[in-house]
A protein has these predicted regions:
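RNA-contacting regions in translation and RNA-metabolism proteins
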Residues: 1-149
Length: 149
């Protein structure tokens, strides 16, 4: 059984070592353990386009794997940024699907990181009217949404 209290304490220790004052809440998100950090320094923790947050999540998962036997992958969020971003990406995906179906033309989304592309692919996999494909190379990899033939 995963010790969420111990994991929370490890994250809090990391924040202290970073000189960040913050509170950590534990929950679930998309069937994963979810830690949301509330802090006045949220912009610093999120970074431009979520880059700092992705790095923070990576470091937290390394620390948990090192300190807690059989620690699962956990989601780390700051001020609900990821939840809001996921909802926004899902809306973009739905809008692109509607446009592809209505115009019968492919719709190319802006470049996204692999996590964001996965959200689009998973969301539109449920739509029987469209197909999706990733194209290009990082960091300019994008998704093309097409009406299903």
């Amino acid at each position: 059984m995963f010790d969420e209290a111990r994991a929370k304490a490890i994250i809090e220790e990391l924040l202290v070592s970073m000189g960040v004052d913050g509170q950590v809440e534990v929950g679930t998100f998309n069937d994963q353990v979810y830690f949301n950090i509330s802090s006045r320094d949220h912009a610093l923790l999120i970074g431009r386009g979520g880059e700092s947050l992705r790095s923070l999540q990576y470091i937290v998962n390394l620390l948990l794997k090192h300190n807690i036997k059989d620690a699962p992958f956990v989601v780390v969020d700051v001020a609900g940024y990821k939840k809001e971003r996921n909802d926004k990406i899902a809306r973009f995906a739905e809008e692109a699907a509607a446009k592809a179906v209505n115009t019968a033309k492919e719709v190319r989304l802006k470049p996204m990181n692999s996590y964001e592309r996965r959200i689009v692919h998973m969301r539109l996999a449920e739509n029987p009217e469209v197909v999706t494909a990733s194209e290009g190379d990082e960091p300019h990899r994008t998704i093309v949404v097409k009406k299903r033939p």
